[in-house]
Amino acid sequence: MPKYRSATTTHGRNMAGARALWRATGMTDSDFGKPIIAVVNSFTQFVPGHVHLRDLGKLVAEQIEASGGVAKEFNTIAVDDGIAMGHGGMLYSLPSRELIADSVEYMVNAHCADAMVCISNCDKITPGMLMASLRLNIPVIFVSGGPMEAGKTKLSDQIIKLDLVDAMIQGADPKVSDDQSNQVERSACPTCGSCSGMFTANSMNCLTEALGLSQPGNGSLLATHADRKQLFLNAGKRIVELTKRYYEQDDESALPRNIASKAAFENAMTLDIAMGGSTNTVLHLLAAAQEAEIDFTMSDIDKLSRKVPQLCKVAPSTQKYHMEDVHRAGGVLGILGELDRAGLLNRNVKNVLGLTLPQTLEQYDITVTQDEAVKKMFRAGPAGIRTTQAFSQDCRWDSLDDDRAAGCIRSLEYAYSKDGGLAVLYGNFAENGCIVKTAGVDDSILKFTGPAKVYESQDDAVEAILGGKVVEGDVVVIRYEGPKGGPGMQEMLYPTSFLKSMGLGKACALITDGRFSGGTSGLSIGHVSPEAASGGTIALIEDGDTIAIDIPNRSIQLQLNEAEIAARREAQEARGDKAWTPKNRQRQVSFALRAYASLATSADKGAVRDKSKLGG
């Protein structure tokens, strides 16, 4: 029988000092012996996806204490990728994932907590907490802040839905008037919550639900809706049950590594491909799998991407649907239900409620459930009122969207495309693979060949795009922006948005060893591995080289013979200690970022730290 970890600090005469300090936090004699459960919050006023979380930790803590546990809350950092985008701040986004994971480990292990409730929401916070949870392998439940309502405004006598990306594109489009740009900016992000499309934050919260580590509805129920409060109340109660099951009944099925098994990871990736999720999810799932000691690789993702269709299309791939529409159509379990009927899921998995996948679908798939309370929950909709308050409205759709032929979520028979929303490409400068969000690529450019325009920083590429130096047919290559080379693997949302604003969204390709925001669409290929700074062939591409992209055949090729590539590699090596570094880039890199870069691996490994350099 496992011993409560917290007993290390609460039992025995030699722990009198620790107990004295626990008493100073409000604990009494009756608390010593109860499970101590960490409430891992991420409230900050910097991030709309987290601005409403301040009181939600207290909500969870009250339920933990009412259920027989002791709750202790702490906070992690949280970076807003949208605000950090397009300047030096983006260098810090991906490294913050590792800091978050480490800080959770530090706090939980330093104080011997027995279990956790993770209150996350946005881009690097959910992955960081997920990595920590699988590293620690103690009972955990995730409950996120929820998606933002879609922005809405009237343009050309028509009400349209908006998000952050629309504001960025219109702000850079010289053909858009100042008045219209201002109108879109003010309408794009109306409430608290994670940005309203299938961007990285919402993608990861959906995948956490598919992994079984959060409750049904967690990935799609709006941040502003009163129904979301119940998820927090349930999490506080349920975590005590899971904790006691493990420590008092020796039930290892309560542990996250047994819930988020390899089968669950495959299901999560299958969901991601079917819903056209952010390419960042690939990076984060690979990293989380390593923490769980699961053999889940780019090869597994490639195999899944070749057989899973696209069953859901959401912004930024279409303006028609946002997360509020996904929820109305049944949310994550609506998509999983269709995938299950298509025979594409592993059914032998369980979630934090202890339900198998078939049991969960029977109760929560809107196309089969008889539970009226579940149907009511999935009718939770937007109010259209600007607010930063959680649970501030209780509006509902008049009906569910259960139209699997023409609705937001489709059945296999009526799939948006036979090929899924993500694909892995391989070639002579992406030997270990690269990722493209096919859900956002127009059919006319699934095959694309053109001359390279090479830039060694995102800033130079943006200047060239806005300066008219990139023209129709070009393949923009942005390198030395990988985990090690950036450092920090910047997102390239501004270059892709500016290509659209210049009328080149369907006329150019963009390739990088960096990554893309979940808000990116178009022929945008990222995560090229190995990256330039690690000796990747992408570092050898020159202006004018021909690059051929063939998404249907999963191929990307630099059209040079092997002898020429070898000669360029030899010339690069001859640069000595300057080899595999940008030639003319002026970038101040802090000591903290240099420390991150010294251990960073390429994207095909999840951009995690190279344990071999630490003797592990």
Swiss-Prot record:
Active site: 517 (proton acceptor)
Origin: domain of life: Bacteria
Coiled-coil segments: none
Enzyme class: lyase
InterPro entries hit by this protein: Dihydro-acid_dehy_C, DihydroxyA_deHydtase, DiOHA_6PGluconate_deHydtase_CS, ILV_EDD_C, ILV_EDD_N, IlvD/EDD_N
Cofactor(s) demanded: [2Fe-2S] cluster; Mg(2+)
EC nos: 4.2.1.9
Manner of cofactor binding, per the entry note: Binds 1 [2Fe-2S] cluster per subunit. This cluster acts as a Lewis acid cofactor.
PROSITE patterns: ILVD_EDD_1, ILVD_EDD_2
Pathway: Amino-acid biosynthesis; L-isoleucine biosynthesis; L-isoleucine from 2-oxobutanoate: step 3/4; Amino-acid biosynthesis; L-valine biosynthesis; L-valine from pyruvate: step 3/4
An MF annotation (GO) of this entry: 2 iron, 2 sulfur cluster binding
Family matches, as SUPFAM superfamilies: IlvD/EDD N-terminal domain-like, LeuD/IlvD-like
Residues reported to bind [2Fe-2S] cluster: 122, 195
Modified residues annotated as N6-carboxylysine in this record: 124
GO CC terms: cytosol
Residues binding Mg(2+), per UniProt: 81, 123-124, 491
Keyword entries, A-Z: 2Fe-2S, Amino-acid biosynthesis, Branched-chain amino acid biosynthesis, Iron, Iron-sulfur, Lyase, Magnesium, Metal-binding
Catalytic reactions of this protein: (2R)-2,3-dihydroxy-3-methylbutanoate = 3-methyl-2-oxobutanoate + H2O; (2R,3R)-2,3-dihydroxy-3-methylpentanoate = (S)-3-methyl-2-oxopentanoate + H2O
One of the GO BP terms on file: isoleucine biosynthetic process
Family classification: Belongs to the IlvD/Edd family.
Subunit structure: Homodimer.
Purpose: Functions in the biosynthesis of branched-chain amino acids. Catalyzes the dehydration of (2R,3R)-2,3-dihydroxy-3-methylpentanoate (2,3-dihydroxy-3-methylvalerate) into 2-oxo-3-methylpentanoate (2-oxo-3-methylvalerate) and of (2R)-2,3-dihydroxy-3-methylbutanoate (2,3-dihydroxyisovalerate) into 2-oxo-3-methylbutanoate (2-oxoisovalerate), the penultimate precursor to L-isoleucine and L-valine, respectively.
Protein name (Swiss-Prot/TrEMBL): Dihydroxy-acid dehydratase
Gene name of the encoded protein: ilvD
